[in-house]
Regions:
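Basic, amphipathic alpha-helical patches used to engage nucleic acids or provide basic targeting signals
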Residues: 63-73
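Short, surface-exposed basic-aromatic patches at helix termini and helix-loop junctions that form
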Residues: 73-76, 102
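A short, basic-hydrophobic beta/loop patch
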Residues: 76-86
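GIY-YIG nuclease catalytic motif and its immediate N-terminal context
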Residues: 1-59, 63-64, 85-102, 106
Length: 110
């Protein structure tokens, strides 16, 4: 499936990270990376804005997000999309995840 668009998120460090945005529920092939579960809301000028609800990383995007341990929480918060950035390095994924959680403070991250 084609991406809904692209989003840039800024971590606490000030670094910007580019993500592709997809509807929640889309199946992906087995790749690793960082993801943001979000809720798309109408923005100004006819576009959308995205409220980040959860930031995580995975070795396998082919695992359905509906099976995630926080899936009920996402749903209650209005989750309707997932933003993906592929990254093969576990060290890099963890660093990005920490930076984005600290900068975005998503509601569903503990």
């Amino acid at each position: 499936m084609a991406a809904l668009g692209r989003m840039v998120f800024r971590g606490k460090s000030g670094k910007s990270y580019r993500f592709k945005v997809y509807p929640l529920g889309v199946r992906f092939r087995k790749i690793s990376g960082v993801y943001i579960i979000g809720s798309r809301l109408p923005g100004t000028n006819g576009g959308h804005r995205l409220v980040p609800l959860y930031v995580g990383h995975t070795e396998d995007f082919s695992q359905p997000f509906g099976q995630h341990r926080k899936a009920r929480e996402f749903t209650k918060q209005g989750a309707d999309c997932v933003c993906l950035q592929s990254d093969d390095s576990e060290e890099s994924r963890l660093a990005k995840e920490r930076d984005l959680i600290a900068g975005l403070r998503p509601a569903c991250n503990d």
